[in-house]
Design a protein with these regions (language model features):
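Class I S-adenosyl-L-methionine-dependent methyltransferase catalytic core
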Residues: 1-274
Length: 274
């Protein structure tokens, strides 16, 4: 988000991370059960960051690893990886995903620890201190952008929408259940713990996007930048992950369900009966 960067600002660039849509990126590479996670990172985003900032054999950490997207992409690229996941269900699935990647020929090694990333020194082995080349992670987004949706037809009525796979467990300690201020305070603690694990010159890469809550914009990228600064990190770059495909000089849109639904409704208002 260039607007939230201090002047003159770090390096800005655009990454083409949606040359394939998300389903194709995950098909076969990830276990079918992984689709149930409410907030999965796009594999190409993780792979691009890992390729950009690390070399084969180096160590990558994701302190909020979910189903292990960062870990899977890292070991496919010949890096080693460590992940921390708060919920046992997803930690087990991340470990299974690592085993699946190894069966597919991934050459790196990875390990998942189940625990609270706000307490990284208590969760991870001490020998990892100052060994991590890259931290890549993402804080929980608003519930409005979690999960998947399905259109449903009702007899004698217009179609409806059902949302599913959009919730974590009910454990109140999960940051996903906290308000924005509490979530960012917890995320700052996580970043502070990550800083102690970085090798000299190591990088922390955080993916974030804004969303709307009750009609108001929540500028998560700017809030994340502030959290990084509080954790003692120095902004180095801002990479925009393009969520559309590129074909020469043409852009291939990859709209969400709700974007398409909004377009359909707008067209009906302009041309009733179409």
């Amino acid at each position: 988000c260039p607007a939230c960067l201090p002047s003159p600002g770090p390096l800005l660039s655009v990454w083409a991370t949606a040359q394939q849509d998300s389903r194709i990126q995950r098909r076969g590479r990830y276990l079918p059960a992984s689709t149930a996670h409410p907030a999965k990172m796009l594999p190409a985003i993780a792979a691009t960051a890992i390729t950009h900032y690390t070399q084969p054999g180096e160590l990558v950490l994701d302190p909020m690893c979910g189903i292990g997207t960062t870990l899977v992409e890292a070991i496919h690229l010949g890096r080693d990886a460590v992940g921390v996941e708060f919920e046992e269900r997803w930690a087990h699935l991340a470990a299974a995903g690592i085993a699946h990647a190894r069966r597919q020929g991934a050459t790196g090694s990875a390990e998942v620890f189940c625990g609270d990333a706000r307490q990284l020194p208590a969760v991870l082995p001490a020998h990892l201190a100052r060994r991590v080349a890259l931290v890549i992670t993402s804080p929980p987004y608003g519930p409005s952008v979690h999960g998947q949706v399905r259109a449903e037809q009702r007899s004698g009525q217009g179609g409806g929408v059902r949302k599913y796979d959009n919730r974590y467990s009910r454990d109140p300690a999960n940051l996903a259940h906290h308000g924005l201020d509490d979530m960012l305070a917890g995320f700052t603690r996580i970043l502070t713990g990550c800083r102690a694990l970085l090798r000299p010159g190591g990088i922390v890469a955080v993916t974030a996007r804004p969303w709307r809550q009750h009609g108001e914009l929540v500028d998560l990228p700017a809030a994340v930048l502030a959290a990084e600064t509080r954790a003692g990190l120095i902004p180095a770059a801002c990479h925009v992950a393009l969520l559309a495909g590129l074909r020469g000089d043409h852009r291939v849109a990859r709209p969400s369900f709700f974007q398409l639904d909004n377009i359909r409704k707008a067209r009906r208002r302009v041309s009733p009966g179409t």
